[in-house]
């Protein structure tokens, strides 16, 4: 070997050895009483961790790192450059967290369990228990597809996620359909990604606690045909929301439902259609059932509310006149939408409409919406 080759080989061996000299980091480590988070960042000046369990009454968009009252736990660096901290084991749930390295928001590089909520990525901490019993463990799984369909109403090709239950491909049975609508700044993948929707469906159906059903999760952003999410231009956002929402609501009935009923083995009648959604999707649920009261027999908005303007009241009266099987709405008591949900409850009561107002502690969060979906599924198509 000549001198240049020897030098090149030596550099390669040095880099190879350096890479493997980096300490092995496992994170998170869940013990009996504490969870330990760790990250290799030898050049960092400060590393902290912020988790959703620190403020369960927060909203799903999270507390920005620059907020003066954000709760974080400071991590300490050892001589190998590994930062670590331990916190008490949170209650049973699927929690999310991020590290802040010198103020920069990052994932836990040692944790492969990552969620995407339409605007950001989050590392996941799953604490098993009663709350999470339907998030894992199923042995018979349904299938999910990302499906493109034509939407003449919105003038574009659009995409939706479709869940078919275990056994769909091997039988001739027709199924009822749940149309499951996402919230603001999310997309057609978010119900499955953030709420573990298909895992909950698999578990509930396998246990015989929910009817086997097809679940359709469309993209609810009229100016976007598929994930990833693109924000509306600021100058157009406020004036376009009502117009775009109305167009999307029309497209659900005129484009999405016909596509599903032409391409999947479904029972194509009101008694076998349900609609539910969270936040913006809850508003879409209220709007589509008011505009088309003869389409859905199961009406299940979450994390949203009503109002007393005449158009809204007229829509509620139309639903009552058309008839329905189940009106079930839900909100966390710390949700900023909770006052509006109380108004909706009052309006339904005043109109003599049989309904359920399901509440629990917590805010405008995925922790609540997962539980709401898990609670709702056994009530559908009974």
Show where each model-derived region lies.
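Non-catalytic cap/lid and distal C-terminal segments of serine-dependent acyl enzymes
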Residues: 30-382
